[in-house]
Amino acid sequence: MKVNKFFKKTTHVLLVAGLTIGLTAPFTGTTAQAAADTVPIQILGINDFHGALETASKDASGSPIGGADYLATNLDNATNSFLQANPGATTDNAIRVQAGDMVGASPAVSGLLQDEPTMKVLQKMNFEVGTLGNHEFDEGLPEYKRILDGVSTNKFGPIVEAYPRVKSDMKIVAANVVNKGTNTVAEGFLPYYVKEIDGVKVGFIGIVTTEIPNLVLANHIKDYDFLDEAETIVKYSAELRGQGVNAIVVLSHVPALSTGNPNTGTKQDVAGEAANMMTKANELDPNNSVDLVLAGHNHQYTNGLVGKTRIVQSYNNGKAFSDVTGELDKTTGDFVSPPDAKITYNTRSVTPNADITAVTEDAKSRIEGVINETIGLANKDVISRDTNPDNKAIDDKESELGNMITDAQRYMANKAGADVDFAMTNNGGIRSDLTTRLANGQNEITWGAAQAVQPFGNILQVVEMTGADILEALNQQYLSNQTYFLQISGLKYTFTDTDDLDHAYKVASVTTEDGTPLKTDQKYKVVINDFLFGGGDGFSAFKKANLVTAIDPDTETFINYIKDQKAAGKVITAQKEGRKVYKSQAEIDKETKDAAIKAIKEATKINKLAEKDKTLTGTTLPGATVSVQKATANARMALAAGPNATADANGKFSVDVTSLNLKKGDQITTTITDPNGYSTTFQATVQAAATTPPDNGNGGTDNGNGNGNNGGTDGNGGTNNGNGSGTNGGTTTTEDPTTTTSNTSTTGTSSNTSLPTTGDTAGLATVFGVILTTTALYVLRKRS
């Protein structure tokens, strides 16, 4: 779902405020003194029940809430209070409605039986009309229609086939879900439903969020179009008014949130898509006559007005219900004024409805053998899906349970021979913490607890993706204020800030789990569920992937992984591991620079320089630029031997240093700059050139006889070394590649101590001295 920025930023604070004050807006209601020309009406609504037959929670004071049997009692009590306040009213004046997601993402007690126990409970509680939520599409609308119709099936095994199902009398309205290319509402559902109360007609229009294509398996929505919410409301409200129906209620699976203080008794603001929907509808048709909207999908408290339209929502999982009351004018056929409402907790301080309890207990008995089976062990009582247990300023969106689930998917895919690199799953598919039971001093994981974590049964697909597409998918987490995000296995990444208000963070770097950088042009195998493969939750990058193969559904995969660990004698020890790490841009810049300099230092070997050498050679990073200059104030840049003095594909380089006229003792600075612009310097001291030894023998062309001292003469007047091994003259150096260290960056350089050189170091001064002395003696002899 998309939610406006103010809504997203205020969700947590306002929800807490709503809980703290008990969820109650002033209940003005109708009374026994209502005028005879008006009709009292009560609308009791729930949303996002998700098969929560016995799910317990707590209110702001810590008191227990939740459970279908308690909800039945509390709804009956609310109706009785309404009837007592309006003696002329009957139960026909009290209507029970729902705003979608009654089924799907359900605990085992309902989910294992295809949510048929939930449909039975709603039938017993007399819910008269409702709409679709995204989870009604989880297994396709035909399957939801089968559940409504109470039709048997042999598709899901014996415990489902044997369940004593019932046909639902509840009308389903879904005006903006139509068969593709038509205006016909899908699966024979209705665009609206009209109920007449004491001569006044009330219309109920059904609306589903147009985000459904991003929330549901592509195969389950391919046959439908989802029409604009506001335009559909305007269309059918006009049609209803044409039939004399002026009191109009919209049952919408569209998110909303109150932004005011419900305790003030004054008009409250409402934010979110439901508010935007009604604002647009009012602009399109100011006379649309919509008096009430029941919202859903984002599981929040809502109770406020948009114009003259009341918008309500009552959390999720049966924690609370909306109690809306008003008066209908018999003359106009409309509400006298915007209806009043209060959001009431489903408290457990009442006596639970025995009939509903019996349905739940029957369902539990049918699945007991399955859900109570111990399938594994854990090292703690709860493995949490919480991504920010320490309340850090920046939530990294990594959870210990998310790590366990994706590790399980990667493990099981590889066990099946798929040879995958990574696994990713949408966090919305993780429906509860993994709880354990203490038995024999151990934390046992049951089948039911595991199923509650991954209840959807989405097919796991092994797909091939490029590194670039993986990077795109990771970045898509940071759109829409991280409403949708991923849990990952096999890779790690760092994210940092951006200046984009709609994209607060970006992925700075990605590596595999062993630290190898992700290559954007390389293809990887990734395990994802078919929901993500269809671009679910807005992750369009996954739609670019190519299907390789499929493995078991996510529920079975998770359960079988836990069983495998138990069979191997392993206790599960899931934890957060820093797979997603936030760093500031300054931290990233420093780390990037340090890593680049380290890489240059490790790759660089420079051969030694001696006096009058013509080239400097060595190896460094391929593509790096190499420059050489004398380390003096008047240094001149050396001429490069190759274009731009760039190291070749093997990292080899050669720089022409003839122009530097190197002399012994010169300080030479070599600067290496990598292809990304990071550089460091290396310093060396030019050493003396190797001495050119004189030849031995006749005319200085042979080695002579052997063993005279340096500078002596042989019998033929030739000079020799006296060692019998003279060589032709010339400068020599010994290649002894040496690297140095540096702390330079793209904007500055620093260097280390001089680079040592080796080689022959015969003193030329001695040779010249001998020559001069000999010449002087010869001149003196001639003069004498």
Curated annotation (Swiss-Prot):
Stored InterPro entries: 5'-Nucleotdase_C, 5'-Nucleotdase_C_sf, 5'-Nucleotdase_CS, 5_nucleotidase/apyrase, Big_6, Calcineurin-like_PHP_ApaH, Metallo-depent_PP-like
Induction: Present in both exponential and stationary phase (at protein level).
Signal peptide start-end: 1-34
Chain intervals with Low complexity compositional bias: 730-759
A Pfam family per the record: Metallophos
Any one annotated GO CC term: extracellular region
Residue ranges the record assigns to the propeptide: 759-784
Membrane topology: Peptidoglycan-anchor
UniProt motif (LPXTG sorting signal) ranges: 755-759
Main location: secreted
Compartments it resides in: Secreted, Cell wall
Alphabetized PROSITE patterns for the sequence: 5_NUCLEOTIDASE_2 (PS00786)
Gene3D superfamilies: 3.60.21.10, 5'-Nucleotidase, C-terminal domain
Biased composition (Gly residues): 697-729
Residue numbers spanned by region Disordered: 690-761
Modified residues (Pentaglycyl murein peptidoglycan amidated threonine): 758
GO function terms (MF aspect): 5'-nucleotidase activity; metal ion binding; nucleotide binding; UDP-sugar diphosphatase activity
Transmembrane segments: none
GO biological process entries: nucleotide catabolic process
Sorted UniProt keywords: Cell wall, Peptidoglycan-anchor, Secreted, Signal
PANTHER family: 5'-NUCLEOTIDASE, 5'-NUCLEOTIDASE-RELATED
Name of the protein in question: Cell wall protein Lmo0130
Native organism: Listeria monocytogenes serovar 1/2a (strain ATCC BAA-679 / EGD-e)
